[in-house]
Amino acid sequence: MKYRCFVLTVSLLAFVYIDTFARKNEPSFAVIVDQEVMDNCKSALEKYAASVEADGLKTHIIVDRWNIPDSIRTVLYTLYKTDGLEGAVFIGNIPVPMIRDGQHLTTAFKMNQQRPWEYSSVPSDRFYDDFNLKFDYLKRDSVNHLYYYYSLSSEGAQSVNSNIYSARIKPPKYKGKTRFELIDAYLEKVVREKESVREISRITYFAGQGYNSNSMVARADERISLIDQFPVLAQGKGHLNYIDHTFDESVKWRLMAELSREDLDLAILHHHGAEDTQYLNASPYASMADRWLDMARKFFRGKIRSARDTIASKQYYIENYNVPESWVADAFDPERMKQDSLIDAAMDIHIADLEGFTPGARFIMLDACFNGSFHLEDYISGHYIFNPGHTVVVKANSVNTLQDIWSNQLIGLLELGVSVGNWAKEQFTLESHLIGDPTFRYVSSRKKGHDFNYAIAHRRDEVRFWKKMAKEEHPEIKALSMKILFQKGVMNPDQLYVIQTSDARPTVRLMAYQLIQQRGSDMIVPSIKAGLYDNYELLRRFAGIDASKNQSPALLDDIMLLRVSPGITKRVDFQIRRAAELYPVEAALVAYDKQLEGRRGVWYEQKREEKANLERVLAGNEKNMMELLDPKVEQRSKRFNITALRNSNQTAYLDSLFQFMKESDDQSLRLLLAEAFGWYTRSWKKCEIVDFCKRQASVETDEVVKNELLRTVKRLTD
């Protein structure tokens, strides 16, 4: 393939295009590389670019010579507007935007920004791929020069809706190998995998200890939905495998063997994580009494070892837990410590375990916290793609992430030839990232028909096309069409409610539900009510979450009915319990009693006994809100209670919060409350909060508080 090269300067960035003689209307893709990678890996880069070109994407190789995120963003935006850019990949040491004041764009990250900036900022490439977001430059890190800190501006969008997809190809630490050798080998692997031309038909999913409250119903329903999302599975032409952390005392070896299967196409791994660890088993899963005793002995040995005063700790457990001294006598014996350490290491997958490992799954989703911390020198997801084997792309998170998310949303599009990048773009959050080649895609199971990979990126404005696609039988095509038509204002909440309450396919109903909840309408509460009783666990779970965030009085009876229901599933119960604790004391207790009237049996007697604890929690919430107005209560306590509003979205005492905002002379707490109001995006009181923030901003004398109030208005109306 012939290439032509020319040099162009935009803003502060000098870059090199390596381009084919392609038609102007062809979609394009950008490869951003640092100068050293270009100098040392040019041949591999050109082969990779040629493989992307062969798949229909005009490819630009752009050399970053200035290390300035704003300039890279400018180039990408220019290509997006003028050259049909659909995605980009950052290879090597490309600047890392570290985002501040944007925690509401994450699913779970809520760290105090007073902590060191490298920890309290979110490494995010949404800076590069979402052009609706606006950022204010703050500074460059004085130690790690790749870190550039930005504040999310209130002038831009307050939700993620990426215009293009993006990914990182950044080598982690490998002993004895340079980053250039690793990049060369990886790009050669990508080219080979692109040439292999395979359909997706073999999928494995996994659940680690403690994930989604260990709900087996959640995992069973995930199987049902995956079979629905991938018709090839329903037709008996593929294979769907499930591994649970309870299958073995240490499930690690089974999971690694499964991931190394040559014929595995996709692996979806739900577990907890860190930048260097995939947490699988918290402790050995055992069913025999002798193993329970072994684990108990090991537990107390570990507690004593980690104590500041080991002698006092040992005596404490002996006296308070009746632990025999013989159980812990060898706590510091070197051989015993080694054995305990080996048991701990066998519980999880660590970076060291991946040395020489050859994963077979082409695409792996790590639905876990921190596994995608690409900004660090070493990170576990990077080892999956840079190892030998077949894995070319991983989806992972740069910081912590929420368990209760729809991680498999639209994943069946992969069966239709949609690239991993175009699929991932539909559910990017601030922390979610692709590690590897985002253009990788499986061959479509449909030999004829529309090119959905092209349509998802370049036909979004064709309303007539998506109306036609909304009539498709394939649930993922219908769900995608609904999403696009809703974004275009063509499909309304009433139409979506009909779909939510009548469609036979669980993921189609869930998409309808999710879309209704995104925009204020009279259908929000009816949608939540219907969702609470849907037969799809994930939809019920989301309805439970939204019931706790909405807190409409119209939902209270349903919440309390489910609160005492014996058939409620574990993770839905977790969400419903939270919702039940957010209402005013008297109303909540009356509703609770109402659902127990006339009910007999041990189960309901236990629920009556639980009322005392519910009343204690409700009274505690009321006390916390009232203390905001008490000048005798220390600031630290008030700060904690205000910060907690980000999660609770408490509306029962909204008048007290408004009063505090108007009357308090503590500007730091007022600023904190103004920011906390911005989390009430799904509250039944959202409009009231918006009106209050507007009025308060109009008379606010503190400029910082005023700006935060206006930012909150933007967040609640975006």
Which residue ranges define each predicted feature?
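Bacterial Sec-dependent N-terminal signal peptides
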Residues: 1-24
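Catalytic cores of nucleophile-dependent amide-cleaving enzymes
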Residues: 121-186, 294-406
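Amphipathic alpha-helical scaffolding segments comprising HEAT/armadillo-like alpha-solenoid repeats
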Residues: 459-468, 489-501, 521-532, 552-564, ...
